[in-house]
Swiss-Prot record:
The keyword Oxidoreductase applies. One of its GO terms (cellular component) is cytosol. The lineage of its organism: Archaea, Methanobacteriati, Methanobacteriota, Stenosarchaea group, Halobacteria. This is Dihydrofolate reductase HdrA. GO terms for molecular function: dihydrofolate reductase activity; NADP binding. Gene3D superfamilies: Dihydrofolate Reductase, subunit A (3.40.430.10). It comes from the Archaea. It comes from Haloferax volcanii (strain ATCC 29605 / DSM 3757 / JCM 8879 / NBRC 14742 / NCIMB 2012 / VKM B-1768 / DS2) (Halobacterium volcanii). It catalyses: (6S)-5,6,7,8-tetrahydrofolate + NADP(+) = 7,8-dihydrofolate + NADPH + H(+). Activity unstable at KCl and NaCl concentrations lower than 2 M and activity increases with increasing concentrations of KCl or NaCl.
Length: 162
């Protein structure tokens, strides 16, 4: 199964401020993001899950949480570790699971990712949440497409670092 991180980030790696995106909404980015993850399970932190309850993404939500809890959503599953999240996604017969944040979840999964799909928003923004740094030697830029308001980059972990 492939683990893929999906995020929108500014040039300074900012992904959020006070729980919101720090830049104006980019409808084309939101559309491609929702379309990409619609039919597959997503892995996200509890806070991110709670913030999206009115419009949950993905076919299932694997919510990372250290505390024992259940969710009042049939498609939500709790996981306490990367391994447990991967096992849950595999039990759902997923070929791909998308890691969609927040910052601590991105950092936790970074060493385990196969791909990153990053919407690069031009400019630097003030924020309190950042996408983790990655070792450029371990990644290859596979595709880059310019869109209005963002550039979509697809990164693949290099074969030598797997």
């Amino acid at each position: 199964m492939e683990l893929v991180s999906v995020a929108a980030l500014a040039e300074n790696r900012v992904i959020g401020r006070d729980g919101e995106l720090p830049w104006p909404s980019i409808p084309a980015d939101k559309k491609q993001y929702r379309s990409r993850i619609a039919d597959d399970p997503v892995v996200l932190g509890r806070t991110t899950f709670e913030s999206m309850r009115d419009d949950l993404p993905g076919s299932a939500q694997i919510v990372m949480s250290r505390s024992e809890r259940s969710f009042s959503v049939d498609t939500a599953h709790r996981a306490a570790s990367v391994e447990e999240a991967v096992d849950i996604a595999a039990s759902l017969d997923a070929e791909t699971a998308y890691v969609i944040g927040g910052a601590a979840i991105y950092a936790l999964f970074q060493p385990h990712l196969d791909r990153m799909v990053l919407s690069r928003v031009p400019g630097e923004y003030e924020g309190d949440t950042y996408y983790p740094e990655w070792d450029a030697a371990e990644w290859e830029l596979d595709a880059e497409t310019d869109h209005e308001g963002f550039t979509l980059q697809e990164w693949v972990r290099s074969a030598s670092s797997r």
